Amino acid sequence: MCRAAWALAAALLCACAWADAPCRIAYDLGSSGIRAGSTAVDTVVQADIDYLGPLLAGRGLEETVAPTRAALRELAERGGFPAHCQRVGGGFSAWRLALERDSATLADILARIAAESGVAVLAIPQGIEGAYSHLAARRALGSRFRTSHVLDIGGGSLQIAGERSAWGALLGQKAWQRELCRALRVTDALPCALQPMTREELATARALAAALLGEAGKALPETVSLTAISRPVTRGILPAVARLEGDGAVREGLARSSLATAIDRLAGMTPQEMARLVGGPERFAPYLLSDMLLVEGVLIATGGQTLQVAETDLTNLPGLLADDHAFAWGRRHACYLARLRREGLDAYFGDPADCSE
């Protein structure tokens, strides 16, 4: 993200006291569902909708429109949010992918959603989402957040977010494994049978991670420290490495060398052999090795030797609720959609006051 855009992100989120702010409702539309919150009520409510799956399968977002409209209406009622509040939604990784593929189709979908739900949904740029993530991590972790950046691995996207710099890509848990499945198994199936890997396949996987994550090191400061907050790390990688090392110690961090050793040990095993060795929740097993390779790649790209780990249920809601610019676009949504068709993600950075549409 360029410096000017990041300066805008910082300015947008610098004032987050809502006591005197107008009533707002925000909707965080992620890869696998919607979360909703309001400045008027502490409640956060959610609905599960798979946005990433249809996109990765090449079907687009059309099949998600009806459940999205219904969820946007139902969530406000379930959360007890005041009816007079302004409503804005932020579309993140899956929505950015849809925009990249066909901006006109996405703009039409957003127009229909707004007309039938009263919610103005915007496609939020990666860097702005980074600002949201950093703000949410500071609020959620408090004194436990002692690093310069937060590492947030979702299903679709990966974020490395700091106060003044951020980087992200469509390399979340499922999207990254899809890259591996294509490269090593020539399939789009998710999850795919990555194990056992040969030494040559493991080298290919690491080279792929280096290629896809290499831009992170260029976009971020020379010195970066990371706190991982997502369940693929907190409930998958961290306990697996602890079991492999067998010392029973409670860990709040992870050494890159320990992660590399774990990868080398597990890659050649069958999934069943790995499960017997490391245990852990069954739902994490199909992605454990690919998650490890992803995090190792992040540490290499950012020059990190250690990773702090502190689980929190991070959402984009605090940042979106504080984003005056997004809510200004919500009031000029037709103009925003016209610009979205022409300018793509850059439409967000325009000035709503300049609208003539």
Named regions from a protein language model:
Residues 1-6:
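Bacterial N-terminal signal peptides that target proteins for export
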